[in-house]
Amino acid sequence: MKFIYTNDKYEELGVLKNSSIDFEIGKYDVASNDYQMSISIGSWNREFDKGSLFYCQECEFGGILDGKKVDTSKNSITFKGKTFRGLLEKEYVQPPDGQAYYVANGEANQVIDNLIHGKFNDLFVVDNVGLSDIGVNYQIRDLNLLDALEKMLLKADIPSKLEITFYDKKVHLQAVPIVDLSELLRYDNSYGISMISEKAISKYNHIVALGKGELIERIRVNLFLQDDGTWNTSENAKYAGLKRKTYLYDNSNEEDESKLIESSIEATEKANGTDNLNINFTTDEASLFDYVGSKEEITGIEFKEQITKKVLKVTISGIISHCKFEYKVGD
């Protein structure tokens, strides 16, 4: 990988040399979506400072310089800041005046374009506006922009993810369908790679969701986990008796039953946690939010989960870069 750097006017200055960069990108509230970069003082161009860009063409890894620390004992200068994905966390989606929600309805890329319009000094652009064939219909109220985009796209008519790519001096965004790679990319010990697998403990399979009201007037919904992983009001005999595990969700301000159901499921799934897998690679084999499979032979842990975080560690000696990728699945 080759990383180009600029001045604060985004004019290219050259290729990073004699440096190391640690990136973490991924799902909102799972990944930090930031980076730390150390450069040999002798290789540092003083025009490369706060507000400058660095990036790898045709991929997501890059960011804007922010914090800076000089360590003369190590003969290095360290920069910290947000990745391009992390910059989306700097904004919140608020409802229009006089309305309870911002209603995101229509073709996905058009909606994304509307949400970022007038922000990020035109560094961010949206590709294929009106052309994705992905429809969204999602109500947003005071959500972090990255969080809102992830949730909106996941609930689209075609479950989707936000793709971020840097090229032509711009950060390009677009909605693309989530891909199930669990059969194609199914990792096990035979790969000869380092794996850490963790299976979640017994999960909640019943929700008591309480909304607005008092006593018998209070909104109350019982939801049951189904065999396909969805929730509805039909009891599932598979999770009866000792196998029943109930989560109580209490939101005394919610008067919309459909919103109560949605938020109670979200809270329960967060409380449940997910199966976890950490794998180390030297190449980038899959995209954020795609599904991959895992089987750990010693314990027999086996599951299919989304990639929710990527860590990239880059060491650049001269101009030769050595890369190590780590994937995390689950929350």
Which positions does each model-derived feature cover?
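Short beta-strand and beta-hairpin "edge-sheet" elements
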Residues: 53-80, 163-164, 190, 295-324
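Oligomerization/assembly interface segments of phage tail-like spikes and tubes
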Residues: 23-41, 75-87, 209, 269-284, ...
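Extracytoplasmic/secreted envelope proteins and their assembly/folding machinery
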Residues: 109-113, 146-150, 206-207, 261-265
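Short polybasic amphipathic segments
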Residues: 1-8, 52, 172-173, 206-208, ...
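Acidic, small/polar-enriched beta strand-loop surface segments
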Residues: 179-317
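Short beta-strand-centered interaction patches in the first periplasmic/extracellular domains
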Residues: 69-79, 83-88, 128-204, 208
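Surface-exposed cap/loop segments at beta↔alpha junctions
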Residues: 42, 47-125
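Solvent-exposed edge beta-strands and adjacent loop segments
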Residues: 1-28, 188-197
